């Protein structure tokens, strides 16, 4: 994946970090889905879609140059993500409700997703406010190939997300509280779990 050849300015650095952060968030989501077998609910899938839209905005900035329409994609994706995360928070706000899925540092992932979407919007606001300041970080000497790799990882995660969503939901409506993949038999799921467990043990 080709990116614009330019010195690493503060604005470009924020775009690079934004794309990397979204990749990390998607990797964590897939870890809990594949390793801990916590399938995403429909609202969770919409939150992932919002993050992917925001990620495309960052990716387009790095590949085709800084554009207002790219930042618009980031903001729209972040707003969609934030709205969906807020909706899920409201669904589990009643006393005694343990929430959906695992907690991370005391907060559920949809709460972290809301925080992330707000931080992304703030980052874009900072970028737009200082976009006229072209301060180069030449001393950082960041290899552009590193962020080409991040771009390819992002596209791979999108493909994996699409495949897993089709397997989970099939051709119809996604289950509100999914516990299995509609397009996979029990034998297929057992085989995948065994393979993932074996790979995890071998890495350890």
Where are these regions (language model features)?
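Hydrophobic alpha-helical transmembrane segments
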Residues: 60-64
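Secretory/periplasmic and organellar redox-cofactor proteins
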Residues: 1-40, 51-57, 67-204
């Amino acid at each position: 994946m080709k990116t614009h050849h330019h010195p690493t300015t503060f604005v470009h650095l924020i775009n690079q970090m934004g794309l990397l952060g979204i990749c990390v968030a998607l990797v964590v989501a897939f870890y809990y889905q594949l390793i801990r077998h916590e399938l995403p609910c429909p609202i969770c899938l919409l939150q992932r879609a919002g993050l992917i839209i925001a990620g495309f905005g960052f990716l387009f900035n790095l590949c085709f140059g800084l554009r207002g329409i790219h930042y618009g994609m980031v903001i729209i994706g972040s707003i969609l993500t934030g709205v969906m995360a807020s909706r899920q928070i409201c669904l589990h706000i009643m006393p005694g409700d343990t929430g959906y899925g695992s907690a991370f540092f005391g907060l559920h992932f949809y709460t972290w997703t809301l925080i992330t979407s707000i931080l992304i919007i703030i980052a874009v606001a900072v970028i737009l406010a200082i976009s006229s300041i072209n301060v180069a970080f030449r001393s950082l000497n960041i290899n552009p190939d590193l962020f080409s790799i991040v771009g390819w990882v992002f596209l791979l995660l999108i493909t994996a997300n699409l495949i897993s969503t089709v397997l989970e939901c099939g051709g119809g409506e996604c289950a509100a509280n999914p516990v299995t993949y509609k397009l996979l038999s029990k034998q297929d799921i057992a085989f995948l779990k065994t393979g993932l467990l074996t790979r995890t043990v071998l890495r350890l």
